[in-house]
């Protein structure tokens, strides 16, 4: 019989099996002076189809002594990095923003977990901005680590993130709201109402910026309006990929 930890919100429930741990390997692409170790943990989580899928997360332990009542965990949920496997934070150099946050957390004695999210760094398509998928990547990552090293952790954990990670933090707070060991979420600039931003807000703002740059005779290669428009198109493509991950019949032309 498999023991599980139940996490639920509203009518949605899912379980984190005790055997969700797959393996752990050293992370060797970058270093952080404040970290005693940086590893890549592979674990099982349900994908958007409800099937078991591998997921990965960076796990950073501090150099300080383990508290008498066990380690506490802070999960860092990253912002938009792209949708291809090679974009996964665990396959890249450490982001500078993440380094700043991780240094402070490690100095304070926290274990830091940074999930890649479903479909990043592993097989499958990344369901960009899928709230439930992001929340599961976080919760399964935390519970897997705590289950694997059961005697070393206090149980208490929280989540913090920015941009896409801000949305992931809010989603985690929804799905973990009945978990008494979950202590809170910090969401910086969470992704929200992107359809309205892309279709209504951004075109007006970019048009005004373009007019200003034209009047100033700004060279094409130096125009922020052009670079911003290209970025906007990229986000649109990411969103399309995210929808396609869950709905393969989605037509990009729609």
Question: What positions do the PLM features span?
Answer:
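Short, surface-exposed "cap/lid" segments of acyl-processing enzymes
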Residues: 48-56, 60-109
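Catalytic-loop region of hydrolases
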Residues: 1-66
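Alpha/beta-hydrolase active-site loop
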Residues: 128-151
């Amino acid at each position: 019989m498999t023991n599980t930890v139940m996490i639920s919100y509203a009518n949605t429930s899912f379980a984190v099996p005790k055997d969700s741990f797959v393996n752990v390997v050293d992370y060797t692409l970058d270093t952080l002076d404040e970290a005693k170790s940086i590893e890549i943990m592979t674990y099982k989580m349900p994908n958007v189809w409800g099937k078991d899928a591998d997921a990965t997360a960076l796990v950073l332990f501090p150099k300080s002594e383990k508290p008498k009542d066990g380690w506490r965990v802070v999960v860092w949920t990253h912002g938009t990095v792209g949708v291809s496997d090679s974009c996964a934070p665990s396959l890249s150099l450490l982001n500078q923003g993440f380094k700043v946050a991780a240094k402070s957390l490690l100095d304070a004695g926290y274990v830091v977990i940074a999930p890649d999210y479903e479909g990043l760094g592993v097989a499958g398509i990344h369901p960009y901005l899928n709230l439930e998928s992001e929340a599961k990547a976080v919760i399964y990552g935390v519970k897997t680590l705590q289950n694997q090293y059961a005697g070393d952790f206090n149980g208490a954990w929280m989540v913090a993130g920015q941009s896409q990670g801000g949305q992931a933090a809010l989603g985690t707070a929804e799905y973990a709201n009945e978990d008494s060991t979950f202590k809170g979420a910090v969401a910086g600039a969470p992704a929200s109402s992107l359809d309205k931003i892309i279709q209504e807000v951004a075109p007006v703002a970019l048009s005004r910026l373009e007019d200003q740059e034209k009047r100033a005779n700004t060279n094409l290669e130096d125009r922020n309006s052009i670079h911003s428009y290209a970025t906007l198109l990229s986000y649109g493509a990411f969103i399309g990929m995210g929808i396609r991950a869950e709905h393969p019949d989605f037509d990009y032309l729609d």
